[in-house]
Amino acid sequence: MKRKFVSNLILVLVLNFIIKPFYILGIDAEILKITELNNAGTYGTYFSLLSLSFVFNIFLDLGINNYNTRNIARDNNKIHRELNGNLSLKLALSFFYLLLLFTVGIIFSYNWYEIKWLTVIGFNQILVALILFMRSNLSALFLLKEDSFISVLDRVILILFCGYFLWAGTTNTLITIEFFILSQTLAYTLTLIICIAILKNKIHEFKLHWNIPFFKSTIQKSLPYALLIFLMSIYYYSDVVMIERMKNNYEAVSYAHGYRFFMAFNMVGYLFAGLLLPVFSKMIKEGNNVSPITWLSFRLIFLIAILICASIWPIKDELLFWRYEIIGDNLLHSSRTFGWLLLSFIAISCNYIFGTLLTANGSLKQLNIMAFTGVFINLFLNMILIPEYGSEGAAFASLITQLFTLFSQIIISYRQFHFQLFHVGGIQLFAFIILTCLTSYTIHYLNLFSTIWYINIITTLIVGGVFSLILRLVSIKDIFKLVKSHQNELI
């Protein structure tokens, strides 16, 4: 079982670090570039509609997946009752979700074209939610390799399908936002069918079970968690909607240029959260001291985020030109926006650690108060900054919001777990930041090793990694300790 777990963990990490970033920066970013060349502003409209669908995404789940995984993992014989009951609730929530999106679209004065594609995007989100639900059953049955395969299957299909039209010599006039949205529908549908087929071999039948008391009980238990996710979704995704509504879809495109890279980098924090949640949950339940592993995780993700930010910062312009072929004021504006997003990435990465810890602890009241305040700060800043600064103002508002939530979560964690706030070695961290930034500046601006930007990035990452070892901020032993903790808590 331990060997199975470790091999699956390695498989998940490899798949997520290779396939998903390649999809974001290869397929999605290429679609952005081509659609903006063919019909400027259309990707901005799509990006805004997609972000709006993300804001209300929690209404497709309400914590059902976690509940489903936990119950079936404890007793596999419950899978027929739990799966069928939760599937029925999922379908009911899906109808409500589409109705909610349609209503919000009307309130926001979207035209018929935008309403139509918002509906299709909403349907795609329903397919994604159903895939995640089916995956929760695979995970609960310990079908780990199958779950890993399904986790990236939709992206693989999109890479193959869209990649053919993008790079097989066909005319780029075929590449439109409509093509991209419907390609996602195809990929999600095929993935869902394959996922159902895998589960079908284990449970043999799917049967809808409408149990109203069960629905009410599940929703009531999930409300605090659902409220937290909804509030966080507002300040994570509403900025793009506000940019497009308050300015125009061209400004939304400027935000999207850097955001594609931000999302690729964000895979690091997402994987940390998935790794740590079961570890924190069991340690808290057993009354173990979570301080060492919390600060170890913080050091690891902080160092990774600083390395990425420092290595990318000096060549923001070159990177955006290479990926999107934008020039002039458009490039300068997008680059400044990207800069604020890079700084936000550091705060968000650290938020994954403390947010996961507090969620595992059940500190939902404190987190909801924090998130509500974060929403107010974000919306207030966006309303002031977007009319004047557009995407740059929204990215800056995001940075301030994420810094607020980070410091709030550190303070809450300190009160809940009596942490030593400077347990991580503040002097070493400060020295690491200074040394890494100076190294990046020297390598990039003085062309110390090469004039090729990606070689300079790799060099900065390597030298920064050496600094982290010299300053004893992290060691290979620490990484194995974290993986072993995850292994021990799940097996």
Regions found by a protein language model. Give the residues of each.
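N-terminal membrane topogenesis motif
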Residues: 1-25, 80, 84, 212-228, ...
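Membrane-proximal transmembrane or re-entrant/amphipathic helices at the cytosolic face
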Residues: 441-491
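Hydrophobic alpha-helical transmembrane segments
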Residues: 115, 119-122, 149-201, 372-378, ...
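Interfacial segments at transmembrane-helix termini and the short loops linking adjacent helices
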Residues: 35-40, 106-121, 312-345
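Membrane-interface junctions at transmembrane-helix termini in multi-pass inner-membrane proteins
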Residues: 71, 127-153, 342-373, 384, ...
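Interhelical loop/hinge segments that connect adjacent transmembrane helices in multipass membrane
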Residues: 1-6, 173-181, 193-236, 275, ...
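Helix-loop junctions and terminal segments of transmembrane helices
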Residues: 60-76, 258, 262-298, 355-360
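Signature of the first transmembrane helix
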Residues: 3-65, 98, 102, 124-125, ...
